[in-house]
Swiss-Prot record:
Induction: By stress conditions e.g. heat shock.
Post-translational modification Phosphothreonine, affected residues: 200
Function: Acts as a chaperone.
MF (Gene Ontology): ATP binding; ATP-dependent protein folding chaperone; unfolded protein binding
Designated gene of the protein: dnaK
Protein name (Swiss-Prot/TrEMBL): Chaperone protein DnaK
Keywords annotated in UniProt: ATP-binding, Chaperone, Nucleotide-binding, Phosphoprotein, Stress response
PANTHER family: HEAT SHOCK PROTEIN 70KDA
Pfam families: HSP70 (PF00012)
Family stated for the protein in its record: Belongs to the heat shock protein 70 family.
InterPro entries: ATPase_NBD, Chaperone_DnaK, Heat_shock_70_CS, HSP70_C_sf, HSP70_peptide-bd_sf, Hsp_70_fam
Source organism of the structure: Acidovorax ebreus (strain TPSY) (Diaphorobacter sp. (strain TPSY))
Amino acid sequence: MGKIIGIDLGTTNSCVAIMEGNNTRVIENSEGARTTPSIIAYQEDGEILVGASAKRQAVTNPKNTIYAAKRLIGRKFEEKEVQKDIDLMPFTITRADNGDAWVEVRGQKLAPPQISAEVLRKMKKTAEDFLGEPVTEAVITVPAYFNDAQRQATKDAGRIAGLDVKRIINEPTAAALAFGLDKQDKGDRKIAVYDLGGGTFDVSIIEIADVDGEKQFEVLSTNGDTFLGGEDFDQRIIDYIIGEFKKEQGVDLSKDVLALQRLKEAAEKAKIELSNSAQTDINLPYITADASGPKHLNIKLTRAKLESLVDELIERTIAPCRTAIKDAGISVSDINDVILVGGMTRMPKVQEKVKEFFGKEPRKDVNPDEAVAVGAAIQGQVLSGDRKDVLLLDVTPLSLGIETLGGVMTKMITKNTTIPTKFAQTFSTAEDNQPAVTIKVFQGEREIASANKLLGEFNLEGIPPASRGTPQIEVTFDIDANGILHVGAKDKGTGKENKITIKANSGLSEDEIQKMVKDAELNAADDKKKLELVQARNQGEAAVHTVNKSLSEHGDKLDAGEKEKIEAAVKDLEAALKTEDKAAIDEKTTALMAASQKLGEKMYGDAQAAQGAEAAAAQAAAGGSAGAAAQDDNVVDAEVKEVKKG
């Protein structure tokens, strides 16, 4: 069985790790980086770029370069968070037929799981290149506060990428695994994981206990905000720069898509620089132009100014921390360690705020960019049965229930319940002779069902006529280890039953997923063909260059007929190189190599003659008689064959 890899599918950056024995290994991608930007670009010729190459061309292709797709995954178009992003993103967010938020690129509608699958495919390929074998199984992380629809959509993304997702695991829990596994401390420890990433914020309170030599990680509570992260910090800087530039130059950059893309890049860079320095220059020449000519942008940004711009965002992370502590039934002083995860936690003001709330210095021995992927790889090893000394007990982040009479939310499973779990409750009809009941499943903490997130609905039909309150309908909620919900309803009188796996009443259908999987496989085949064509071209161009160089140096030694033959073969190959026909390029390359054989022999003969002349001259100079007799002793009488590489 192959390895189960661990993937941190991040809003801004993604990371992949594996276990080698008892050691974890974060794998470098093809560019040599340990994290990959979660950016996907769709080129005019149909090529899809992922990671650093997509990021590099974003300024010139903003409408077809998708970033932060994770903020849209499993979300409805009408949700206020999505509506807010529509005005900020340079690409088009559109409403799918099922009401989900999708993205439109080059006239084609794409689902967020389909876009995220491109990043997962890059992570899969990174692991395969390193391991030298196919990878088909993965543990993928999600924010702890992701709801059922978002978890399901992430799992779908894995399937589209050709991965069997063995487990969806919460990011803070994964970070705790990475932190706690190598700690030798005996006794129980309570840790707080503060995870502020590119697009989401989570906090989890986790107890690490030693139980008979086994490390037990039990999540006591979790809380967060799935629409708060580094992207929002960048936006505050962008808004500030736009305002300052408008004051100085009287030009509004907010409607200029190309300028916005450059501003985004500059804002991210400035934010990172200000974690280590007190001031930075944002310098963007030729940012725009008007009737008076080109305009240049040069603005100084201090750390103090940045902190004042984002103070309210940092403050927003504290309320979930307070709730998580309360839900865990402990006080702040009970926390032994605070772990920071996510790139945004490098910001000094964030660290200061965390220290102020928890009353202790956060740990510095956890890599905020890599800990989550490492934890996912550890969980992969546990699931494959190679590791027996770890037990992970996670929780469901939000309450789950059904709508009952009067639109009330009747909670079946409360938030922070350890998963997997199962719960059944008996309900009855609300009217006389009611032939069917509709079970509407919601997720959230509000008392009125409609104020929560509707996950799905189904009917149980064929209930025999009876007065209200008589039929006995048993509703069962079953949450699996991925945090994904399965709901069943059974009429106890007739034994009639109906079950569904909650796939948000929108989400991707099985047919859509299968189609996307096929498209992805076709893309992979196309990519392979493109690569083979590039390699054939490179080989052909190298042959043309070598033969032309040799002709200019030794062509005069050839008969006119031989020289013309080689020149004709060069022309044929040059013509083939302009086409997309790999077979023709290969054929003409072979023909040129065959035609230029005589030229090679002439060059070889000339070189040998020159060496012989040099040797004779040297021998004459040295008196030459002593070594003459033995001059053939070192020549081996054998033929050397060219080994053709396949």
